[in-house]
Amino acid sequence: MGTTLDVSRAELALVVMYLNKAEARDKLCRAIQYGSKFLSGGQPGTAQNVDKSTSLARKVFRLFKFVNDLHGLISPVPKGTPLPLVLLGKSKNALLSTFLFLDQIVWLGRSGIYKNKERAELLGRISLFCWMGSSVCTTLVEVGEMGRLSSSMKKIEKGLKNGNKYQDEDYRAKLKKSNERSLALIKSAMDIVVAAGLLQLAPTKITPRVTGAFGFITSIISCYQLLPTRPKIKTP
């Protein structure tokens, strides 16, 4: 009975910890937003209203969030990182920070505080292009980092000779990191499609339903990436 209660308490603590993260709540709202976009298919109705209202609400979560990527822009990079990956990483930070900053003006426009509607819409499109550019940079960074991980894993395999590579702690750590980067690569590549859909760059191919489906999947991936580590329950 005590063990069952301990497990339940630990599970609830994980849920509380997860929901206390502003980023996690934002991604859950994002899943609702794009799920509604998928259901509406761009047609007027309840689902489209949920899509629009959730999109506006999410912008409040992101107020002053651009500071995070500004900090990343000026922060030092790990030693040994190739220059192309450094430049791509810094470009991603700059573009994402610009997107988040401009998104605040979009929120001011849609909430009626900023009266120049045309300029707000223009800045909205520019911000989406910045987000699309940051997703492209992220995709290229993940491809490059996965290549570096693959190379170092092959070196470990050669060093082990006939040993079991999965019993090597360093190899397992790099394999886990590689899996995480693979998931991040899928997410960033799909986000490029989402951005293209929001910008209506290929409206006949990337329809609101396609945009909603891709956005929902990337939101679920983001929610998964933010999951806290499960604590080990001591058994008597």
From Swiss-Prot:
GO terms for molecular function: identical protein binding. It is a multi-pass membrane protein. One of its GO terms (cellular component) is mitochondrion. Signal peptide: none annotated. Residues 2-92, 228-236 are cytoplasmic. Involved in peroxisomal proliferation. Promotes peroxisomal duplication, aggregation or elongation without fission. Homooligomer. Interacts with ARC5 and FIS1B on peroxisomes. This is Peroxisomal membrane protein 11D. The lineage of its organism: Eukaryota, Viridiplantae, Streptophyta, Embryophyta, Tracheophyta. The gene is PEX11D.
